[in-house]
Amino acid sequence: MAGKAEKKSNTRSRIISYVMNNENTSKVEISKNLNISMPTVLSNVNELMESGVLVETGEYASTGGRKAKSIGINPSYRYAMGIVITANHVGMTLVNMRSEIEKTDRVRMKFSPETSYCGELSILVKKFLEDMEEPEKLLGIGISIPGIISQEQHLVVKSHALKIENYSLSFLEQSFSCPVYFENDANAAMMAEDIHQYKNAIYLSLNNTLGGAFCIDGKLFSGQNQKAGEFGHMILVPGGRKCYCGKKGCADAYCAASTLTDGKYESLELFMEALSEGNTKAQKKWADYLDNLAILISNLRMAYDMDIILGGEVGGYLADHMLALGEKVMLSLIHISEPTRRVVI
C-alpha cells in the first residue's frame, strides 16, 4: 500500500510540476509529455481540481467535437515568501503559485549575529504579512544569505559580507512557524531565473562582492563542498589588486559593484548618475569595468559553453550598455566559429 501511495504522490508531483512550467496546458499534453496513461491523468487532474490546486483556464480551438479545456495552476492556492539578507538591508517578496509577485518591500536593517536580530526579523516579517487574508496558505520561507552555506550542518560556513563564520541558522529558523529554507544568495538568484528555462546557464551576481552559480540540466550544481560558482575568486589579473580573500588579482577586485563606488560614491546609483552626466572619471572607470567583465565572461564561456546571466546591482544597469559589453566579449571569442551563447540580464 505504501508503494502505491508513494507512486500516486510522485505522479501528482510530476503533473503539478509540469503544469507550473507549462501554463495553460491540457490533459492530453500532460499524458503525452509525461508518458502517463490518460485514465491516470484524468483521475489525478480531477482530484487536483477538486482540491483547488488546478483550475480551468479556458478552451482550445475546436478541430471538431468537444473543445478541450485548458488547465493551469491556481495562483492563490498557496504562497511562498523570499527573504534577502544583506549587511544593511532585508528584502521581502511574496509570490503566488505562478511565481507572480504579490507584494515586495525592502527595509534598512543592519545584520547582527546576535539572537536579537532574529527577533527583529520575525517582527518585520509578521508586519509584512499582516494583510495576508489566509496566513495558513504560506508554504514556507526561503532565505538567501551572501556566503557559503552548509545544508548538512545547517550553518553559514563563512560570509565576508556579513562578517560571520560557522554561524548556526537554527535561531533564524526557530523565529518562524513555517518551513524555512536557506540558500546562498547567488544560488537563490539562479533558481529565481527559472533554471528549467535555461537548462544550462551561469549566473553572475554583480553586487558589492562578486558571486556566482550555475545549473546543469535544469538542476543547481553546488559541487562537493557547496563552493561551486565562486567565480569571484578566479584569478583575472595575475599579481593584480588585492582581494578581501587575501589573494591578488581575483575577479571580485575588478568586477564587483564596489569597484565602481570605491569610496568616492555613496551608492552605485550615484555612480551611474555621474556616468550618464558625462563625468570623465566615471566613464573611464566604467570602460575599465566592462573590459574586465568581458574577460571574465569570455573565460566562463570558454570553460562552460553556457548562457551567462548578469544579475545583482550592476546587472540592473547593464541594459543600455549590452552592445558595448557584447562587442568586448566578442573580441575575445572572435576565433570561435560556432554560434556563441547568450549573455543576458
Task: List the predicted regions and their residue ranges.
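Short glycine-rich, Thr/Ser-proximal phosphate-binding strand/loop in the N-terminal lobe
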Residues: 2, 84-116, 155-156
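Glycine-rich phosphate-binding loop and adjoining helix at the ATP-binding site
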Residues: 104-200, 319-331
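Glycine/GP-enriched mid-protein hinge/lid loop-to-helix segment characteristic of carbohydrate kinases
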Residues: 104-106, 170, 176-280
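Single conserved hydrophobic/aromatic residue that forms the stacking wall/gate
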Residues: 334-345
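Extreme N-terminal segment that seeds HTH/winged-HTH DNA-binding domains in transcriptional regulators
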Residues: 1-33
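Conserved phosphate-binding catalytic cores of ATP/NTP-utilizing and phosphoryl-transfer enzymes
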Residues: 56-80, 180-203
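Adenine-nucleotide phosphate-binding core of ATP-dependent small-molecule kinases
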Residues: 116-135, 251-254, 261-321
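Gly/Thr-rich phosphate-binding beta-strand-loop-beta motif of the actin/hexokinase/Hsp70
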Residues: 67-102, 203-205, 210-215
